Design a protein with these regions (language model features):
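Short, solvent-exposed mixed-charge patches
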Residues: 1, 271-274
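Hydrophobic, membrane-interfacing alpha helices
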Residues: 1-131
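N-terminal "domain-start" segment that seeds a small globular fold
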Residues: 119-151
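Short loop/turn microsegments at loop-to-beta-strand junctions
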Residues: 135, 158, 232-233
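Short active-site neighborhood of thiol/selenol oxidoreductases, capturing the structured segment around
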Residues: 148-171, 177
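Hydrophobic beta-strand anchors of alpha/beta hydrolase catalytic cores
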Residues: 159-160, 189, 235
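Structural microenvironment flanking redox-active thiols in thiol-disulfide oxidoreductases
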Residues: 172-208, 219-225
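Thiol/disulfide oxidoreductase modules built on the thioredoxin-like
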Residues: 206-211, 218-269
Length: 274
């Protein structure tokens, strides 16, 4: 499962797992600090805010050449462009600084952060074991011929984009994906339209001046159910063995797509050496 619906909003499961880990850290920190009437909730909030800022700044620095042509997009964090190690390092520095300034925080911080880290390791590890392999859902080409994702992959790493013509973020990210399909010839790109017919999809493609290969139809939106995502757009990144390497819910930017393709290439190199 990739996301959970909370009313009209689709929330990524990974974000919920992180929130659960933070709650564990806050709870344990509160219990340990009760004797000194000291909690660590405020410290955790500061750590999260600084971590987000540092992770975004590091990501932008790494992919600055991509952002250079559209600098305003640096502020659009909806593309999911964050560098986790930079955020983690910044968060730990905040914890060390706050503990150094106030001795009463040290024990609650140590126990709370340890508990939170253990909780994250356990629940994220359990979630990783549930990551689905390449779905076997039957799809159709625009010409009406049956096919599936394994047949489309042809032994290559694959990017699968779930989209619909009525979805504004889907339409905005299409030029980015179309350009990547032209450039990344070692990767198979598949565009699985969700819940619409061939005429609707073809009309959009013809009016949008997009040159896309491997556009498939999933009229029953079975692919979304198979991977556990009701959100559009959803993009899946599979290695050549059909194992899920990464996912992205929401609109991709050029930089965020480039970072995920780099991860896919790294996995491909590792599989080649094995």
């Amino acid at each position: 499962m990739l996301n959970v619906n909370l009313g009209p909003f689709a929330v990524q499961v990974s974000h919920l797992l992180l929130l659960a880990s933070l709650l564990v850290a806050a709870g344990v920190g509160h219990l340990v600090g009760r004797r000194q009437k000291t909690g660590i909730s405020n410290v955790l909030v500061d750590m999260v805010l600084v971590a987000l800022l540092a992770a975004r700044m590091a990501f932008v620095a790494i992919w600055f050449d991509v952002y250079r042509s559209a600098p305003w997009s640096i502020l659009d964090i909806r593309d999911g462009g964050f560098t986790p190690w930079a955020g983690l390092a910044a968060a730990l520095l905040v914890a060390i600084w706050r503990g150094w300034r106030r001795a009463a925080l040290r024990e609650p911080l140590i126990w709370g952060l340890t508990a939170g880290a253990l909780a994250w390791s356990v629940i994220s590890g359990a979630a990783d074991t549930l990551n689905p392999r390449l779905p076997t859902v039957q799809l159709k080409t625009l010409a009406g011929e049956p096919t599936d994702l394994a047949a489309m992959a042809k032994g290559k790493p694959m990017v699968v984009n779930l989209w619909a013509t009525w979805c504004p973020p889907c339409r905005r990210e299409m030029p980015v994906l179309a350009a990547a399909q032209q450039q990344e010839t070692a990767v198979t790109f598949v565009f699985a339209n969700q819940g619409e017919g061939a005429a609707v999809a073809q009309r959009y493609l013809s009016t949008g001046e997009l040159s896309l290969a491997n556009v498939l139809l999933d009229s029953g939106a079975e692919l979304g159910r198979a991977i556990g995502s009701t959100a559009l757009p959803t993009t899946l990144f599979y290695d050549a063995n059909g194992s899920l390497v990464d996912t992205h819910l929401g609109e991709l930017s050029t930089a965020s797509l480039a970072s995920k393709l780099k991860k896919l290439r790294t996995r491909a190199d590792r599989l080649t050496k094995e």
